[in-house]
Structures are given as C-alpha cells and as structure tokens.
C-alpha cells in the first residue's frame, strides 16, 4: 500500500511499488476518462522554491485531470517565505489546507526536512543537485512503454553528471534492475559524485565506464540520456561559458548511433540537442514529458489511496 507514503528518493519505493505505479499509469494512458474524477475534493499544494515549468505544470495538469484542485506558489518571493517564514512553519500551515505536497527546493535534503513536519504525503520535485524521483518514474515509464524492458540496457548519460539530480536518481533506480550497464559521459569537472560511484555502482558491482567523448559513448548505447549544463549550479560563470556547449547531439552524431537507440532528456534543453534531432524517430523526449504527467497522476492517486 502506497497510501500516505512520502516519495523523497527513488529508494523509498520497492521495485514492486514502482510496477504498481507503472501499471496504473498505463491504464490511465489507455482510458483517461475512467480516472477523471477519482481525486475529486482533493487538493495538491505545489511549493516551488526554485523556477520550474515542466515539473510544476505536469503536477498541476495531473491533479486537475484526476478531478482535484491545486494551490501553491511558483517562486518564494510570492509567498511568506520572503517574509522569513521557516520551512517547518510553511509545511505545517500547508498541512491545514491540502491533502498532498509537491515541493522543489534549492537545498539538498529539504524534502526530507519537510516530510518530518508533514502529516500528509510529501513528493520531492527536486532538491538541489540531489534527487528528482518523479522524473525518475517518468524516465522508467518511458523506457518501459517504448523499450519494453527495464533490464539489460546500456544507458549512456551525458552532460552535467555532477549537479544533475535527474541523473543521480536514474542511476539509483536503474541499478536495481538486472544487467544494466552505464556509460558516463562528461567533462572531468562535471563527473558523477563519489557517493553515486562508490555507494551505488561499485557497491553493487554494476558495470560502468567514465569517458569524455559523446561520439564514443553513443556507439554502444541503446538509451542515451542527454542533460543540459546547468548555469544556475555554477558559481564561476566563466566556467559555465567554457563548458556549456561541450556536448551537442546533432544529426551527424546520430548516424553513429544504433538504429533502435532511444534519446531521452529531462528538459528543458538549451543547446545540447539540435532541433534537427526532433525529427529522428529515436527522439523520445517529448513522449517522455507526456509520460511524466501520467506517472504523476498514478503516483498521486496511489498516495491519496484513490486507486
């Protein structure tokens, strides 16, 4: 039973619970009208302390399509946070108004702190450079729907692997499925954090390699996960300018990829995937965004005990 659980990290749920969510998401995709009122009378609070378009709108659309309602803020300056209110007090107050919280925060561990003061489920919609579990559910559902299997894949992850919370969450989740291999493509400065390398990959004897060449990595992968170099994570903007265009996936590079390779991206993109790739049948990132809405519908319905 997922009712009243928090989702702060992919490891909070078992593989069986993932499958439960994916099964419901698939059913909703196939017959959305059947689920359009199951959360009637329920309220989602979206507390976004960091800018977001896709994740916030995906959560809001998901709740509205389930028949529920949405309250919240999209930047801290429009809330009592700007007056100095603590996270603890914000969460305890929102508990009086809502049935469920989706929260994004720039500080790692903020969602965990929020859950300590909440009697209603808290969903981590991204905490700094740490984790982004609903993006992971989105990624897994997309792979499952279009590849058919979450096991036995060679996944190349490219770009900002140091600060990229979507990358950290995805590695953590896919490492729980059998025979997956990882190719980690990044500049030396943006390599995967040690805790991911040591506590997840090496501890579980998962095959991986770290390289700097996208052209080399793309040859072996059947899933390519592109990420942007994140301007907001850099203190030194000259360093960002130096690294921002180091990886650009274009039509020429796609010619070196497998015919059945899947290209994913958590979005937003900047320059790392050229628009010409959008027309390639291997580009799945907009289908991925749609899967995100359905998987959030399934997740919220489960946490609220409505499905």
Curated annotation (Swiss-Prot):
PROSITE patterns noted in UniProt: CARBAMOYLTRANSFERASE (PS00097)
Assigned EC number: 2.1.3.2
Keyword terms: Pyrimidine biosynthesis, Transferase
Amino acids binding L-aspartate: 83, 165, 228
Keyword Transferase: yes
Catalytic activity: carbamoyl phosphate + L-aspartate = N-carbamoyl-L-aspartate + phosphate + H(+)
Transmembrane spans: none
Enzyme's top EC category: transferase
Binding-site positions, carbamoyl phosphate: 54-55, 104, 132, 135, 267-268
Superkingdom, natural source: Bacteria
Biological processes, Gene Ontology terms: 'de novo' pyrimidine nucleobase biosynthetic process; 'de novo' UMP biosynthetic process; amino acid metabolic process
Protein family according to the UniProt entry: Belongs to the aspartate/ornithine carbamoyltransferase superfamily. ATCase family.
Subunit organization: Heterododecamer (2C3:3R2) of six catalytic PyrB chains organized as two trimers (C3), and six regulatory PyrI chains organized as three dimers (R2).
Its job: Catalyzes the condensation of carbamoyl phosphate and aspartate to form carbamoyl aspartate and inorganic phosphate, the committed step in the de novo pyrimidine nucleotide biosynthesis pathway.
Record's protein name: Aspartate carbamoyltransferase catalytic subunit
